[in-house]
């Protein structure tokens, strides 16, 4: 069978209509190739994806790159397949775009192993439902917001509170401690941030264990609506074929929904609540259901969630919440205290913070830590107005321990050594639980609270206190 060639009949921004011969219509979601001289000199440089069959042998497609320079009558090749993504070792350490082409200037990527980006979620019979904690080495997360392997965590926070640094630290720890692979999907993010992340990962030495797939703000909506699927396809290969525990970061999941809404409007669908696409729940569901543990390996997702106008009832974040196993909330108030990572220990939550999953000791320590911090928060107004002297003896002890806990929740990161000047620390889960248990039990009431700031394990805090005593 020869190549199936069609021709462009209409171009409306990112929407391109293509006419084929009778009986040769490509299927929905098929990738078609066009040579667009505006992009570069290469042949077949523009990929468009079939979205609708209009009748009269015409298909309506959504472009994955700019359509400036296209004219009616141009030839269009039918690939016969969905968008195909290169997978495996070839993509590690590389930056790809939505259609799997490199954008880092380091030459071509091997096309030996390719997978379609549209795939079904694993069957129920293949899924692994046992809950195992993913140790991240970050104290505040492991203690209070434990990540389930194969789970989905949302990271909420404004600009400049440290979402990217926590992400990079987790990429580093998964690579160094577990030998795991990380995939980063930049969905509708700032090009500058994507560039910064690439260089920081390169300098931090974590790039060889990571694959980056970018569809930035400047890309047409078609690319932004597909880039998360392209990255997920890469992660699925490592899970299913190589039996790896993979970490996928999606920054920002809201932009995926936003791009879907733009595509929906371009295709002439009637909008739903707040102008979103009527298929919002199913679009997000198709992506999220592919992120899971199977009997071969797991994909754990960390998704940054932008909340439009801080309205958590907006359909986009509200639909996302339904899929999440937990939320890591980063707080500007904690940044102001100089405590990093700036995770809010009272606002953050995890589905597996439960004695059935973690054991009684871990659960008990985590809840006691939260109770002490909550009590300290309630007493802060009294302290501000009347001072510490007016508190009861019991409250004074609680406040002193809470302040130590607050500082002990900070931690020097490997990827932030340049800013902090302190070597990074990876803290094992049992050491984290033991350290906080000793503080809440009052074993370290005699140590100054400064000794607990920016340390790894509790032993380091004790050494700090000794050094301070000697210096005094």
From Swiss-Prot:
Its EC number(s): 7.1.2.2
Pfam families found in the cross-reference section: ATP-synt_ab, ATP-synt_ab_N, ATP-synt_VA_C
Protein name: ATP synthase subunit beta
Assembly mode: F-type ATPases have 2 components, CF(1) - the catalytic core - and CF(0) - the membrane proton channel. CF(1) has five subunits: alpha(3), beta(3), gamma(1), delta(1), epsilon(1). CF(0) has three main subunits: a(1), b(2) and c(9-12). The alpha and beta chains form an alternating ring which encloses part of the gamma chain. CF(1) is attached to CF(0) by a central stalk formed by the gamma and epsilon chains, while a peripheral stalk is formed by the delta and b chains.
Role description: Produces ATP from ADP in the presence of a proton gradient across the membrane. The catalytic sites are hosted primarily by the beta subunits.
Compartments in which it is found: Cell inner membrane
GO cellular component: plasma membrane; proton-transporting ATP synthase complex
Database matches in Gene3D superfamilies: 2.40.10.170, Bovine Mitochondrial F1-atpase, Atp Synthase Beta Chain, Chain D, domain 3 (1.10.1140.10), P-loop containing nucleotide triphosphate hydrolases (3.40.50.300)
Keyword Signal tagged: no
Catalytic activity: ATP + H2O + 4 H(+)(in) = ADP + phosphate + 5 H(+)(out)
Family assignment from sequence similarity: Belongs to the ATPase alpha/beta chains family.
Organism: Desulfatibacillum aliphaticivorans
Gene Ontology molecular function: any one: ATP hydrolysis activity
Topology in membrane: Peripheral membrane protein
Classification via SMART domains: AAA
Keywords: ATP synthesis, ATP-binding, Cell inner membrane, Cell membrane, CF(1), Hydrogen ion transport, Ion transport, Membrane, Nucleotide-binding, Translocase, Transport
NCBIfam families: atpD
UniProt-annotated binding residues for ATP: 157-164
